[in-house]
Amino acid sequence: MSGHSKFANIKHKKEKNDAKKGKIFTIIGREIAVAVKDGGPDPENNSKLRDVIAKAKANNMPNDTIDRGIKKAAGDGDGVNYEEVTYEGYGPSGIAIIVKALTDNKNRTASNVRNAFTKGSGSVGTQGCVSYMFDEKGQIIISKEELEDNDIEVDADELMMLALDAGAEDFSDEEEAYEIITAPEDFSAVREVLEKENYPMASAEVTMIPQNYVTLTDENDIRQLNRTLDLLDEDDDVQNVYHNWDE
């Protein structure tokens, strides 16, 4: 099975984020807080929290930092309440962009997101204006380089059958990574099966995958889009940005 793998984009994003660990830990800290408030502090009984913990570990967040975040969220009844908000819009040449944020001030976040779009010659649209161009899917990336670094030998067919038997929809054997796609509701089960088999995951999350990708050839469009994406990346309220640009 194969598809349009975005491992190169994920790798680029991860390398970029490695220089911004503080921002990444802030993002995950908010996700931990929301997961705990939604389903309690016990990962055994809270699949959303288990998924966030797995994401934290994939980003090398120390265990004590994870534990402190869970304890703080569980005991901080009067703490900050974060609300999940989604914005949709267009970048240069009609590039579709979805922004997901966790915020304690929707007015501030809306203003910052709108500013990021405007400065990159884009515009925020109405809810649903571009989301129909994406599919919500669980996506697990297993880096071949990381497997090699950990002296882990993998039989691609065995890994594919393990993933599919656990409920995955698709499996891709790409040059640099194995990519596993699931329905959102099956993501946790598939991830946990792979985790039990000690497969190191470069990325494991429910994401928005474009149905089609758009190539930009105009250098000014590329500069403008990167400006928008950089501004969104710098905003602490922004958790994830999805787009259909084929970088």
Identify the meaning behind each predicted range.
Residues 1-143, 186, 243-246:
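N-terminal cationic and glycine-rich segments that engage phosphates or anionic surfaces
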Residues 141-247:
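Positively charged, low-complexity, intrinsically disordered RNA-binding extensions
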